[in-house]
Amino acid sequence: MFVFEYYNAEYEYSYVNGSLTIDKIMAKSVRKNVGSFDLTRATLVAKVNSQEALGKARQQLRTYNCSSGVDDPGDIVIYTYDNDSNEMIRLFMLPDDSMKEAIVSAIGNGVAHL
């Protein structure tokens, strides 16, 4: 039974002043911080299957998959830098419309291809 206790995982996104913090909530009781990412340094924000994202898909980067785990047309990919290690990372997530608008307004249309 213990195996299935953590099967139900949800992600909580918090976006404040250009910093995106992601927490993973397992079994609706245990919260774990996935990471904090500086979106003001993002080089690309795009839909997962867009030409821009597919052009960078072969880069070998640390990848965080914080999406639903199912192919969803709303999934986006963000290429940015990890606040702790200062290395380029790839982040998959499924934000709602208000989160998408906040990200685009903070980083500008030159980087965002949504």
Report residues per predicted region.
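Polybasic/polar functional segments that serve as interface/processing modules
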Residues: M1, T21-I25, G110-L114
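Alpha-helical transmembrane spans
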Residues: M1-N8
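Short, surface-exposed charged micro-motifs
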Residues: E10-E12
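Membrane-cytosol interface motif
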Residues: V16-N33
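Short amphipathic beta-strand/extended segments with alternating polar/hydrophobic composition
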Residues: K32-R41, M88-P95
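Structured surface patches comprising rigid loops and adjacent beta-strands/short helices at the edges
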Residues: S36-L54
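Cytosolic, membrane-proximal regulatory domains of ion/volume homeostasis and mechanosensation machinery
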Residues: N49-V70
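A membrane-cytosol interface segment of integral membrane proteins
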Residues: T63-L114
